[in-house]
């Protein structure tokens, strides 16, 4: 994981629409590595950056869900709920919206 993290950290963002998706994926992968290392706060930051890098109906709700799960892993249920609510509000037709409803139900 350390080698992968170092490799991804060297990545230079790409401009343009295809670049936005690649940039988001890079940030998301760094978040995934942080989760594997149980560094959930760092993971949340990467997932938030991934959402900003490519705010679309496919990747944004996925990274919001991952950010919520990372917040729950830290015991931050209110912050997790905010991520799930954002999915329901901003991306109600996404695949993650169903999961977000279930995850919100488990918190409340």
Feature-to-residue mapping (PLM):
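Short solvent-exposed coil/turn linkers within tandem alpha-helical repeat scaffolds
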Residues: 12-24, 51-59, 88-99
